[in-house]
Amino acid sequence: MEILKHSVIQNMHKNGLIGIVRDNNEADAMVRTRAIMDGGVTILEISMSTPGALNIIETIAKEIKEKNLDVYVGAG
């Protein structure tokens, strides 16, 4: 866990940006999340006020793993 924490902190310092996704519906939030990733943002926070937030996080985490991306996603 310390290694992951250190990696996330290094990534934050390097890029200076966290993409925060908050929307009123799950489908739009998923589209926005993917667009943010495609734009090169590597740390993402999905707001828990977004409907389906946990599903979005789970789906994006699977995509990150399948594509072996250096992207971090979590809840906020």
What are these regions (language model features)?
Residues 1-74:
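Conserved N-terminal beta1-alpha1 strand-loop-helix module at the mouth
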